[in-house]
Amino acid sequence: MNQPAAPAQIRIDFVSDVSCPWCAIGLNALQQALGKLDGEVHADIHLQPFELNPRLPAGGEDATEHLMRKYGSSAQEVEANREMLRERGNSVGFSFDLERRSRIYNTFDAHRLLHWA
C-alpha cells in the first residue's frame, strides 16, 4: 500500500513593514496560494522586519504629501494608486479604509514591540 507523500517543507522569509499595505496584500495572497496546495507543501513563514521610512520625523508626515515627495507622484497619481491598492486588497479579501489614514509614521517602535511580544 502506498503512503501519501509527506508535504514538502519550505521556509519563507517574508520581509515587511508593519504599515505597508502592499505587504499585507502580499502576505494574504501568499497564504491563499499556500492554502490551494492542499497539503502538498508545509510552509514555515518567518516575518522579517523592514522599515520603509526610517527617517520620518517623530510626528510623521501627511501620507499624500509623503508619497508625492518620495515617489515624485502627483496627487492624482497617489489617488490612482490608492484605488489600485483597494482593488488588489479586495481581490485577496483584505479591505483598506484609506480615506481615514492621513499620516504615515516611522515604524521602528512597532517592529521593536513585535520582536518582544
Language model: regions and residue ranges:
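Extreme N-terminus of proteins, especially the signal/transit-peptide cleavage junction
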Residues: 1-10, 38
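Short active-site neighborhood of thiol/selenol oxidoreductases, capturing the structured segment around
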Residues: 7-21, 26-30, 45-48
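Structural alpha/beta surface segment adjacent to cysteine/selenocysteine redox centers
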Residues: 27-117
